[in-house]
Swiss-Prot record:
Family: Belongs to the UPF0227 family.
Protein name: UPF0227 protein KPN78578_10770
Pfam family, one: UPF0227
Organism: Klebsiella pneumoniae subsp. pneumoniae (strain ATCC 700721 / MGH 78578)
InterPro entries, per the entry: AB_hydrolase_fold, UPF0227, UPF0227/Esterase_YqiA
Amino acid sequence: MIIYLHGFDSNSPGNHEKVMQLQFIDPDVRLISYSTRHPKHDMQHLLKEVDKMLQLTADDRPLICGVGLGGYWAERIGFLCDIRQAVFNPNLFPHENMEGKIDRPEEYADIATKCVTNFREKNRDRCLVVLSRQDEALDSQRSADLLHHYYEIIWDEEQTHKFKNISPHLQRLKAFKTLG
């Protein structure tokens, strides 16, 4: 089972395309929708929904995957639910760059202070990070500088922030998922 979390643009047709691409790895791909506008509510909702899906699956090696803001959540929810994560261009600083787009961006900073101390150290090697050198929305190098101590980083030379085509990375994702 692969759980897919969309980014800030929840209505983008690219979400369906990514789900279709992920089905080449595992036919059981489940998209969880969330508001993107209310971080504390989103966290509770995502934890509940992911836990429910994990209770109902026979897959002993599930994967949670997210793009952009979905990558932010996939890393944290995956850690809390003890499943591997794959993130594409994760928005690691939504409290800085979501100003004016969501109601309470400061809630992201609050969530970070309430998260497990050094959670990335405890999550070491359980998240695969794919960053685009062409990301027009986020500073990919800043993300790499923060994450490379803990996770494998794969650089993509062609995709933009929304990462429409993940297919060049599917075999690596599949191998990562099978590690459990």
